[in-house]
């Protein structure tokens, strides 16, 4: 919204800098006001549409987080770079419904994927006998959402986590 207001002020400044010292009838100012009001309506509609889609996705998955794959198969370091570049995160389910939403992606694709488990996680879904540091220092989820220790060099499905703070 600030960008729209600054753009409007810039246009007015350009108008005045180009030798139009006056706007006796207020046509330029009124035009800028009309444009700004139109842009505000477009912004409100876009925000409403975005939130509607986000709420629908959240409702359908039972999670405020979205887990999305690009269908690539990569190791942990490549996953980290891909998710960072996409402005997402390596999946880190904190609740059972988030883990279920993550597992749904894995089940649909029939593949395993990496996740990150925080030190203070209130929710875990380790498979029997896990964690097993001998298997590796990374963590992967299977198609049922169970967590297993894994090598960080394994090539697994790329899944990134996205969430919104509004």
Curated annotation (Swiss-Prot):
Glycosylated position list: 122
Entry's Gene Ontology molecular function annotations: carbohydrate binding; phospholipase A2 inhibitor activity
Lineage, uppermost ranks: Eukaryota, Metazoa, Chordata, Craniata, Vertebrata
PROSITE patterns tied to this protein: C_TYPE_LECTIN_1, C_TYPE_LECTIN_2
Limits of the C-type lectin domain: 46-161
GO cellular component, one term: extracellular region
Keyword tRNA processing carried by entry: no
Species of provenance: Bothrops moojeni (Lance-headed viper)
Name listed for the protein in its UniProt record: Phospholipase A2 inhibitor clone 03/12
């Amino acid at each position: 919204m600030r960008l729209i207001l600054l753009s409007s002020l810039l246009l007015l400044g350009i108008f005045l800098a180009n030798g139009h010292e006056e706007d006796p009838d207020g046509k330029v100012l009124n035009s800028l006001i009309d444009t700004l009001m139109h842009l505000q309506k477009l912004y409100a509609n876009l925000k409403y549409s975005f939130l509607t889609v986000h709420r629908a996705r959240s409702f359908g998955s039972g999670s405020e987080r979205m887990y999305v794959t690009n269908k690539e198969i990569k190791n942990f370091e490549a996953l980290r770079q891909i998710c960072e570049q996409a402005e997402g995160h390596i999946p880190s389910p904190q609740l059972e419904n988030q883990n279920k939403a993550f597992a749904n992606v894995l089940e649909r694709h029939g593949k395993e994927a990496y996740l990150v488990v925080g030190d203070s996680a209130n929710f875990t879904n380790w498979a029997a006998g896990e964690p097993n540091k001998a298997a590796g220092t990374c963590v992967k989820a299977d198609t049922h959402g169970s967590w297993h220790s894994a090598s960080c060099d394994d090539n697994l499905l790329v899944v990134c986590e996205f969430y919104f703070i509004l």
